From Swiss-Prot:
Short name of any one Pfam family annotated for the protein: AA_kinase
EC number: 2.7.2.11
Cellular compartments annotated: Cytoplasm
Keyword presence, ATP-binding: yes
Keyword set, alphabetical order: Amino-acid biosynthesis, ATP-binding, Cytoplasm, Kinase, Nucleotide-binding, Proline biosynthesis, Transferase
BP terms from Gene Ontology: L-proline biosynthetic process
Protein name: Glutamate 5-kinase
Species of the source: Rhodococcus jostii (strain RHA1)
Family: Belongs to the glutamate 5-kinase family.
GO cellular component: cytosol
GO molecular function, one term: RNA binding
Length: 366
């Protein structure tokens, strides 16, 4: 067994993301038998000593049958109506299933905005930490009833990766209707399972298919989430929900994604992956070398242009001369102030304007 699989198998804190297809039937509504089997596997892992946070899809799918709908709606209003009905059913089903073991569950509904805004980010973190301390099972889902962008393709996979870093998890397990990553379309019979992904180069030529009939997150979404988590220092296991027992027992199934050696700090992870980008700073080649290679602060002299309207404390993207993003960071000045000082050396500026535009501690190269 690889070192990554051993790390996942022995992880003291795990986030388990469960896709819609693993929880709902083809005609809509929850499949209680599947859900109970997943709860059994999670309970076994918790009894073995691990803390587990569950990121559960399925609200929209669970709301279809009660509303007389036979397929996933395309319009936002109907999706949100289905989510409002299904969320109740989903929370009740998880609560009933874990009650067999005397476990209490807590529902945590999040939107991307809750992760992107620093204050809400910290509040969500404290809530999840407290639920774990009280030995309750946190059932996390997107707040689909009020969200807009969050109902787009694959967002719950990304949410799971963000939650994994939010709670300081030692591993992320993605469970769905696929049993791992293949080098081609497994439905065509000539594809080979990729047991471990060590770097982005391992994904060259890999075909990312679409999601299932009831889900929104296809393989491309899962790969993106796995890369995000692994880049943040969290190893990932992608496996079939039907193999949940083995996945959570010894990580001996599916595809494992090797994490980077060091974990990003909570603040730098937030800057790089969670915060909304409010504007753009265009920088010259010298500034690119200073920021990316030498990991130094961004000074006004290296900025050639400003795009967007933003304020001190906002997160912006830094683009090099080829217009490609090279870093993200927290700016010290408003966009109007930067426009007045860009291209100037520090010595040309008044004392109160001699701080770096983006300090090295607030910069994250991409």
């Amino acid at each position: 067994m690889s070192a990554t699989r051993r790390t996942i198998a022995s992880a003291g804190s795990i986030v388990v993301k469960i896709g819609s297809s693993a929880l709902t039937s083809l005609v809509g509504g929850l499949d209680v038998g599947r859900l109970d089997a997943l709860a059994d596997a999670i309970e076994d892992r918790m009894r073995a000593g691990s803390d587990v946070v569950v990121v559960s899809s399925g609200a929209v799918g669970a709301g279809l049958a009660p509303l007389g709908l036979t397929k996933r709606p395309r319009d936002l209003a109907t999706k949100q109506a289905a989510a409002s009905v299904g969320q109740l059913a989903l929370a009740h089903a998880w609560g009933t299933s874990f009650a067999r073991y005397g476990r209490t569950v807590g529902q945590v509904l999040l939107t991307a905005d809750d992760i992107a805004r620093r204050a809400q980010h910290r509040n969500a973190q404290r809530t999840l930490d407290r639920l774990r301390a009280l030995h309750a099972v946190a059932i996390v889902n997107e707040n689909d009833t009020v969200a807009t962008a969050e109902l787009r393709f694959g967002d719950n996979d990304r949410l799971a990766a963000l939650v994994a870093h939010l709670v300081g998890a030692d591993a992320l397990v993605l469970l769905s209707d696929v049993d791992g990553l293949y080098d081609g379309d497994p439905r065509k019979g000539n594809a080979t399972l990729i047991p471990e992904v060590n770097s982005p180069e391992d994904l060259d030529g890999v075909v990312a298919g679409s999601g299932g009939a009831l889900g929104t997150g296809g393989m491309a979404s899962k790969l993106s989430a796995a890369r995000l988590a692994a880049d943040a220092g969290v190893p990932v296991l992608l496996a079939a929900a039907s193999d949940a027992g083995a996945a959570l027992r010894d990580a001996g199934v599916g595809t494992a994604f090797v994490a980077r050696p060091s974990r990003l700090s909570a603040r730098k992870f937030w800057v790089r992956h969670a915060a909304d980008e409010q504007g753009i700073l265009h920088i010259d080649e010298g500034a690119v070398r200073a920021v990316v290679t030498k990991r130094r602060s961004l000074l006004p002299a290296g900025i050639s242009a400003v795009s967007g309207r933003f304020y001190g404390g906002d997160v912006v993207s830094l683009l090099g001369p080829d217009e490609r993003p090279v870093a993200r960071g927290v700016v010290a000045y408003d966009s109007a102030e930067i426009s007045d000082i860009l291209g100037k050396s520090t010595q040309e500026l008044p004392a109160e304007m001699q701080r770096p535009v983006v300090h090295a501690d607030d910069l994250v190269p991409l």
